[in-house]
Amino acid sequence: MRISAFFLALLAFAAQPAAAASSPNLLSLEQQLNTMVAGKSADVGIAALDLNSGETVSIKGNTPFPMASTVKVAVAALYLAQVDNGRRSLDDTIDGQSARSLMRRMLVHSDNHATDILLADLGGPRAVHDWLQANGIKGLRVDRNISDLLRSKRDLWDHRDSSTPVAMVDLLKRLYKAELIKPESRNFLLDLMAQCQTGRNRMKALLPGVPIEHKTGTLDGLADDVGFITMPDGHRVAVAIFTRGGTDRPRTIAETTRVIYDGFKAIFTWPFGAPALQK
């Protein structure tokens, strides 16, 4: 049976991820971001969410991008959730090291071996994936440990171990609001992300002095950065920026972060300061 070219095109269009809608107040910021990324050689996915107002902006927000080491946020989240429910402790010894030390190595220094030790103790990638799905985090999948990921042939459009920008920001939001982990664990996570030693030419590059808690991801042809930017009044914006291909990935992340910061600052900075973080 012959299928018309029009019908095939219609099917292809329907298979594309739906565009993530930006909030009306942020359409001007969305236009700025679109103009900026149009001049870049990299393919760029962006999502940003004001954690007070709930307003969002995104570019390719529902398109999957490889997470690289940004997946370590999800690994940390599951471990901390199990600390909170009494199954584990940060003082547990795993492979001769404390979980606390492994978490620090994973998040501050992006240590791949420490990540795989924690991941194996949790039950492997599937355990993290299933926990995310059970908690309603859609659009983020965990398929391999870091060793397997590094051994695999590079494919910038591989959907394994990928996240949409919107899904990553949803995870960040729910961690920040202590919906998936308790406030004490959330604060521990933020403290480690604030000490991140990698990717200083990304989110932090054009925002000197601005508090940023983040986690980078890097593979051949990929550069990512996800985390929280603190606005002048003290409230935070959750941000995920994924880039693949091209030659200007770190600079693109730095410039994108600056545009996001300026855009949210102009609209959502609270005149009397943000509400205090729940202890």
Predicted regions located by residue number:
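Bacterial N-terminal signal peptides
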Residues: 4-15
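Boundary at the C-terminal end of the N-terminal hydrophobic targeting segment
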Residues: 14-22
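Structured C-terminal helix/loop/strand segments within mature extracytoplasmic catalytic/sensor domains
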Residues: 21-34, 64, 121, 170-199, ...
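A short, well-structured edge-of-sheet supersecondary motif
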Residues: 25-61, 229-230
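Soluble periplasmic/extracytoplasmic beta-strand elements of cell-envelope proteins
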Residues: 45-50, 58, 74, 107, ...
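Active-site SXXK
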Residues: 54, 64-94, 106, 239
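Conserved catalytic neighborhood of penicillin-recognizing serine enzymes
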Residues: 88-128, 156, 161
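Mid-domain, small-residue-enriched loop/turn segments at the edges of structured enzyme/sensor domains
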Residues: 119-177
